[in-house]
Amino acid sequence: MHLTVFLLKGIVGFLWSCWVLVGYAKGGLGDNHVHSSFIYRRLRNHERREIQREILSILGLPHRPRPFSPGKQASSAPLFMLDLYNAMTNEENPEESEYSVRASLAEETRGARKGYPASPNGYPRRIQLSRTTPLTTQSPPLASLHDTNFLNDADMVMSFVNLVERDKDFSHQRRHYKEFRFDLTQIPHGEAVTAAEFRIYKDRSNNRFENETIKISIYQIIKEYTNRDADLFLLDTRKAQALDVGWLVFDITVTSNHWVINPQNNLGLQLCAETGDGRSINVKSAGLVGRQGPQSKQPFMVAFFKASEVLLRSVRAANKRKNQNRNKSSSHQDSSRMSSVGDYNTSEQKQACKKHELYVSFRDLGWQDWIIAPEGYAAFYCDGECSFPLNAHMNATNHAIVQTLVHLMFPDHVPKPCCAPTKLNAISVLYFDDSSNVILKKYRNMVVRSCGCH
C-alpha cells in the first residue's frame, strides 16, 4: 500500500511487482554495502503501455516525444545541457550516486548482452562530472559557473536549435549581419523565463583583422521591411580580440520573455560584427561559426524557467484528483498485486520500517532515443513494520507513537502506523522534445531519502 501511495504517485508498487523495470536488492537504511543482484522479467505489452502512460503523466508529457534522429557527432546544445544536468544532479542526490552508478553499470552489462547499442541517442553513456570555467576554449562547450548559478532558481532548462536554414551573411546598405530564429511555442504554459542566453562559437578571425578588437552585437528584430534595414533593438554586446577562441554568451532574457507572452512578435535575432572604428565586417570573417561549422560548435539558445505558484497549485490539485480516482478504480488490483509481493517476501515484511533499494529503468521502456540522461535512477522505497515499541531509528512522529499505543488496546479498530518516506529528493531528466530541442527538467519528490513511521 505504502509503495503505491507514496512512491512515484502510485505506480512504483506496480513497477516493483513487474520486476523488469526495477532492480531489487535487500538492504536497509543503515546498510553500507550495495547489493548488485537484480531480478528481471519481460513486461507484457499491456503492462509496458500502462507503465509508459503513467510515467509520462508524472513527467508532465502528453505523449512520448519522437525527436529527429541525431547525427553521428553530438551537437553543441545537448553537450552544454549535459553539463547543466551534471551540476543539477550532483546537488540533488550526492549520497545516492554510488548506488546509481552501480545499478546503471549492472543495467549496461545486461543491455550489452541483449545487443543494445553502446550509445543509443548519440551522446556519451557515462556522463563525466562537469567542470565550470568562465570561458571555455574547448569543444564541447562547458557550462560556466554563471550558468550553474541560474539552476538554483530554475525548475526547467530548455535549449533551442536555430531554425534559419540558410547559413547566409546578409548585406544591406553596406551592413553585414546574420539571422537566427528559435521556436519558443513549445514552452509549457505557466513557465516564466528567469534567464535566457544566445551562444555562438568564435574561431580565430580572418588574418586581415589580426590586431583588431571586434565588437559583436545581438539585436532583436522588431519589424522587417523589403526595401530597407529592419527595425532593431540592441540586446547585448561583446568585445573580443581577433585571435580569441571560445563561446560568446549574450543575455537575451528580456526578448525571450516578450516572445513567450507575444509569440507573434518573434521575428528572430540579428548578429552583427564591426571593427573598433565602426566598420561593419562579414560575420564569418570575424570567426563566428554558423550552420556550415562542426556540430559541436553550432549556435543555440538556452532559457531557464520557473513554474508559477498558480501552476504548481493547479498541478497538485489535478494530481490529487487523479490519484483519488485511480485508487478507487484499482484498489482491488493493487491489493492483489501487493499480496503477491508479500507472499514472495514474507520475512522482509516482519522487519522494522526502513529504506529499501529500488532502481527504475527508463531504458527498459524503450525510451533511450529521447531520454539523454539518466538511463534510470535509484528511487528507493519504504517498507517494514511499525510495531511497539517504536525506537529512535524508526523516525516515528508523536502521532505514530500515540497511534501505536491505541492500536495495542484496540487492534480491531485502530491500525498500526504506516512505514512511509519522511524525506524525498528531486531528480533531473534530460530529454529531447518533438522538435529536437533539449529540455532539462527537475521533478520533485521522486527519490526516498529516509523512512519513518506515520
From Swiss-Prot:
Propeptide: 31-316
Sequence segments annotated as region (Disordered): 318-343
Compositionally biased spans, kind Low complexity: 326-340
Gene Ontology molecular function, alphabetical: BMP receptor binding; cytokine activity; growth factor activity
Disulfide bonds: C353-C419, C382-C451, C386-C453
A cellular component annotation (GO) from this entry: extracellular space
Organ and tissue specificity: Expressed in the lung and liver.
Signal peptide span: 1-30
Location within or outside the cell: Secreted
Main localization (coarse): secreted
Record-level GO BP terms: allantois development; anterior head development; BMP signaling pathway; cardiac muscle tissue development; cardiac septum morphogenesis; cartilage development; chorio-allantoic fusion; ear development
Recorded superkingdom: Eukaryota
Annotated InterPro entries: Cystine-knot_cytokine (IPR029034), TGF-b_C (IPR001839), TGF-b_propeptide (IPR001111), TGF-beta-rel (IPR015615), TGFb_CS (IPR017948)
Entry keywords, A to Z: Chondrogenesis, Cleavage on pair of basic residues, Cytokine, Developmental protein, Differentiation, Disulfide bond, Glycoprotein, Growth factor, Osteogenesis, Secreted, Signal
Described function: Growth factor of the TGF-beta superfamily that plays essential roles in many developmental processes, including cartilage and bone formation or neurogenesis. Initiates the canonical BMP signaling cascade by associating with type I receptor BMPR1A and type II receptor BMPR2. In turn, BMPR1A propagates signal by phosphorylating SMAD1/5/8 that travel to the nucleus and act as activators and repressors of transcription of target genes. Can also signal through non-canonical pathway such as MAPK p38 signaling cascade to promote chondrogenic differentiation.
UniProt subunit comment: Interacts with ERFE; the interaction inhibits BMP-induced transcription of HAMP.
Assigned protein family: Belongs to the TGF-beta family.
Record-given protein name: Bone morphogenetic protein 5
Protein's organism: Homo sapiens (Human)
